[in-house]
Amino acid sequence: YGEARTAQDSVMLEKTFEEGMQVFPDSAFFLNNLINTYIYSNRNEKALEMLNVAIQKNPNDANLYNVMGRVYETGLKDYANAEKNFQIALEKDPNLTDALSNIGRIYYNQGVNKLSEANMINDSKKYQEELSMAKDLFKKALPYYKKAHEAEPEKMDNMIALRGIYYNLNMGPELEAIEAEMNK
C-alpha cells in the first residue's frame, strides 16, 4: 500500500485495494479507498457498484448513502437519485450535516435555475408561475440549510446559501442577521 501510495501509481493503488478486499473482506478500509479511487477518477458507475457492496455490508451507515448521493449529483447529474440517497442518509442519521447541506443544495440550485428561466420570460403570468416555482424550491431548501447551519455555524457555504434563500424569499430580518454573522 505504502509503495503504491508514495509512487502515486493509481493503477497499482487500485489493484492493491482490490486485492485487500479479497484478503480482508470484512475490512471497510480497502472497500472505502477503492470507492474513493473510482470517484476521483470519474468512474461513477464503478463507484456506485462498490457503494452498493458497502451498503450491503453496512446498511445503516448514513455516510455511504450520502456519498452515493454525491456521486449521483456531481458525477452523473442524476438529481432525483441524488435526492433519494440524501433522504435515506437523513433517515439513518437526521443530524448528518453533509447530507443536510447536500439535499439543501439540490433544491437551492433547482430554485436558482428556475429563477433564471423565469427571468427569460416576457409573459407576466408565465413569469409569475416560474417565479413561484423557484420560491417553492428555495422554501424547500431552507429547513435543510437552517439545520446544517445550526450544527455547523462557522461553515460559510451554508451561510452563503441561507443568504441567497433569504434574499430570494424577501426575508429581510433573516437576511440582515445572516449577513451580520458572515461579517463577524
Regions found by a protein language model. Name each.
Residues 109-144:
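Short coil/linker segments at helix-helix boundaries
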Residues 20, 53-54, 88-89, 148, ...:
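Canonical positions in the second alpha-helix
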